[in-house]
Amino acid sequence: MNYFQAIILGIVQALTEYLPVSSSAHIRIFGDLMLGSDPGAAFTAIIQIGTELAVILYFRHDIINILTHWFSCLFGKNGKDWKARMGRGDNYATLGWNIIVGSIPIIILGFTLQNVIETSLRNLWITVTVLLVFGILLWMVDAKARQNKTMNDMTYRDAFLFGLGQSMALIPGVSRSGGTITVGRALGYTREAAVRLSFLMAIPAVFGSGLLEAIKAVKNYKTDAMFPGWGPTLVAMVISFVLGYIVIIGFLKFVSNFSYKAFAIYRIGLAVVVALLLIVGVLPAIDPSVVAAA
């Protein structure tokens, strides 16, 4: 991978990370088209740190409030009894606990299915299938969902279900935001609430997987045939951070006024295009280096 290709992939990551269209699927597809090979799970996870840093910058005030209220309830003067320590009566502290609960599914599944995630699940036929299925689900759920629950209405049950939706994004093509937004809309959350919860809940998961993949890349730098090198990877990460911040602003404005129908149609169209490219042999279903790593 050269630096121009890294810049393109950084732009693709920024444009698709927050939208319910699956950034990992786009990186997988564009990587094959530009490089002739899969950029790999490590590259994908590390450049996602850039877009997640943009989330932290944009939601910095919310994050500071969540952390200060959570610590104050758990360890400070606000934690008078166990109910208070669990955030009762404090929306920010409760949200902090909900983010923790929502992170449990992806932590468990990410560790237990790590080898499958990095090999078998990167098959483009799987990507095509989930792009299509979750595109239809998003369209149906968004059209029929109630729109009355806000972030403050979240329960531990809802948080866990959000987490299950997020963990589906371990399959390239599902989309982290697509999974959580679909669950959120099915549970009756407004579009704005579902999106903001999706952003905040992704922070621990993305940083956790990104840092783990970075550590693995350092250890296996000379033997990992798929990893494109630190120079291009860091360039792509920086690009995804800068452009990602702009995309967040635009996306939040969009969902305040429009439905997710356009994204659902895009997912279905992309699934059809990728399927055709697979059939005619332009794209391989799975990269040979992924098979070798299995």
Protein language model features and the residues they cover:
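Multi-pass membrane proteins that catalyze or facilitate reactions on polyprenyl-/lipid-phosphate substrates
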Residues: M1-A294
